[in-house]
Amino acid sequence: KPKVRYNTWCSKQHIIETKLLPYFKNLVMRDITPRDIIQWQNSMREASKKNGGEYAGTYLKTVQAQLSSIFNHAVRFYQLPNNPVRIAGALGQYDSDEMLFWTKEEYMKFIPTMANKTYSYMAFELLYWCGIRLGELRALTPADIDFETNTLSITKSYQRIKGEDVITKPKTKKSIRKVVMPDIVAK
């Protein structure tokens, strides 16, 4: 637990409790075969269709990676002969879908709809023109804004974890940065 961020821990715990244990809880690890894994993969695909849509391939990959890491741990430390997840093969896709961004034309059509909503208008202006993430925007404080240099200091992020508002460090050191605000935003 201490080696990962709290949000990561919560995500892993959720996957184990809702996606892995319901299927595998009555099985002994050493008796689980690649065939069992393939049946679980099929049940994951079916479950996502029953819920009105399909899980994203990257989410399925994340769920399977969690299962595989549990088996890897057993192979490494408890003499399990092999990892049946590796033998069974991939469940989800390994590349995420390309991110979609508004063109300037699309944004310019949208932003007038926020004209009477001052806070929303400013939020969208910062998000679009500065290219910051929503969690970074929500974590900004007045001390992070320098109007003399027209910069934002991005040093933290907002997350909602288990119903609580939490300010966290960014995931990576590269996420800590200074962002220049265009004049249109700084005014």
Positions of the model-derived regions?
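Short glycine/proline-rich turn/loop motifs
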Residues: 22, 48, 91-93, 168-171
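Hydrophobic/aromatic residues in well-formed alpha-helices
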Residues: 9, 37, 107-110, 145
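N-terminal core-binding DNA-recognition domain of tyrosine site-specific recombinases/integrases
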Residues: 1-84, 96, 118
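Basic, Lys/Arg- and aromatic-enriched nucleic-acid-binding interface segment
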Residues: 53-57, 61, 76, 80-140, ...
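Conserved tyrosine-mediated DNA breakage-rejoining catalytic core shared by Y-recombinases
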Residues: 89-90, 106-108, 139-187
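Short, charged, low-hydrophobicity "junction" segments
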Residues: 10-19, 123-136, 162-168
